[in-house]
Design a protein with these regions (language model features):
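Electropositive, gly/pro-rich neighborhoods at or near active sites that engage anionic ligands
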Residues: 1-76, 85-86
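Short, basic, glycine/proline-bearing loop/turn elements
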Residues: 44-53, 101-104, 126-127, 150
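Glycine-rich, small/polar surface segments that engage phosphate groups of diverse ligands
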Residues: 74-115
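Buried hydrophobic positions in well-ordered alpha/beta secondary-structure cores of metabolic enzymes
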Residues: 78, 152-153, 191
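Active-site regions of enzymes building and remodeling cell-envelope glycoconjugates
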Residues: 89-94, 149, 172-175
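Long, charge-patterned amphipathic alpha-helical coiled-coil/hairpin "stalk" segments used as oligomerization
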Residues: 110-164
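C-terminal functional extensions of proteins
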Residues: 159-209
Length: 209
């Protein structure tokens, strides 16, 4: 076994042990399948059991997101930190592109909002959006009418994050969010990875736990 394979095996063992500890401390068996997978993944990534009651999951919408991913829906993220946390799937992230900076200046909008406009222009309707950092990205998704296939809306912060997530839930768009100011790149990526594992398992390309 190569050193790379050793490291991968060690990472798998650590993750399995992490989930074992998690399940010994909280019972989420009351939740439906995809809601449970997402909630466990977020708690495992954050070591924060409050997410068991903070996340707002819609099982039917989560199932549709899994189906969309299995069908090859494009994935757009709001920040490089979110992209870095996603494994096994190509993602579109426009935040650091020069065109994003120019659009931000000329339109007088945040870079996150400009990145949403450019991402939508490239991917079109039906994409899976993953927002873990910028409330303004979530606000732009709602105001631009991007017709998402699904939105993971978990931006973090005391300024505008909870309000943006409230607006996402009020919009009726298929989504996953949380009630509090908590969130962030790691938990948004963890939620997405849980859905991706299910999609890969459904497509017969791996995944599952």
């Amino acid at each position: 076994m190569s050193s790379g394979e050793d490291l991968a095996a060690d990472a798998d063992r650590l993750e399995e042990e992490s989930y074992r500890i998690l399940r010994s401390r909280i019972d989420l068996s009351r939740l439906a399948r995809f809601s449970r997978d997402v909630t466990e993944s977020v708690i495992q990534a954050s070591a924060d059991f409050d997410y068991a009651t903070d996340l707002v999951c819609d099982e039917e919408a989560l199932a549709e997101a899994v189906g969309a991913l299995a069908g090859g829906a494009p994935v757009i993220v709001d920040a490089a930190m979110v992209a870095a946390g996603i494994t096994g799937c190509p993602v579109l992230c426009k935040i650091d592109e020069p065109l994003t900076q120019r659009l931000s200046r000329t339109a007088g909008i945040s870079r996150a909002a400009a990145a949403v406009r450019l991402g939508f222009g490239q991917a079109g309707p039906g994409a899976i959006w993953v927002v873990g950092c910028a409330p303004s990205a979530l606000q732009e998704i709602l105001s631009r009418g991007v017709e998402p296939g699904f939105v993971i809306g978990l931006p973090v912060g005391f300024v505008g994050a909870a309000e943006a997530k409230d607006a996402l839930r009020a919009s009726g768009l298929p989504s996953l969010s949380n009630v509090s100011e908590k969130g962030g790149a790691a938990v948004a990526a963890a939620a997405f990875n849980a859905l991706l594992r299910s999609a890969m398992a459904a497509a017969g390309t791996g995944g599952g736990r």
